[in-house]
Amino acid sequence: MDEHTLNTMVAETLCLSPRLTRALSNIIYRKTKGNPLFVSRLIRSWSNDGLLRLSMSRGRWEWDEEKILCQKLPDDVAEFLTRSIEKLSEDVKSSLRILSCFGAASSIALIEMLERALGNNLVDSLDVAVAEGLLDKADDQYRFSHDRIQEASYNMMDFLDRCNYHFNYGMALAPWASREGDDGVFLTAVNQLNLAGPEAVQDKSQNAVVANLNLRAGKKAMEMSDFEAAYSYFDNGISFLRKKHWKEHYTLSLELFNLAAKC
């Protein structure tokens, strides 16, 4: 059904004026594509979860749009939307693959920084996915509407492609995050490199670069007294070192091993 018909249905279901339900109906339309079965399913789900509630004092249904935007979809609705991914343009599918590398959600600031680093129209493509109901854009984040949608996007890549994606995004983000002093994005960049692993390195000179980035990340974690995370960064840094690292990068190697031992 179209947006007008859906709004009429929602208004009648909640016994409210269509004017009062229009914003809610827009959210429902994005999440269900107007499928009547899923509209009813979603309204029931939100009512059961307390996101749609009957106010006895006001004598009408009420809801919190921000909480509804962040709520995950029921499994059957998510499966329906997952099948729609293949019908999207290649640019939008590519943007979903990129976002899926960062997990269930990513900050808009990170995505904008990655867009500048890669020189593409990532934000525009992700906004199309939001309009299609595959993503939610709220609380300064892009979030997959359901884990299955994130998994389907991630599974569009084979293992080697995933490693290359993780590595390239980490290498692209790290210098931008350093220049802008964004520690959160910097740590995310290093995490991407570690997800890729040493096997993703194609230029031998990058081994020491990534090891040094892990050294910096480990030091930041130690400053926050997160010694478990710090050890993980130092250990990952060591794994990126090449066989002759004691000869070629003695100071870097010594610092990584010493700090790992302290954790």
Spans of model-derived segments:
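Internal alpha-solenoid helical repeat scaffolds
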Residues: 244-263
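Short secondary-structure boundary elements
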Residues: 4-232, 236-244
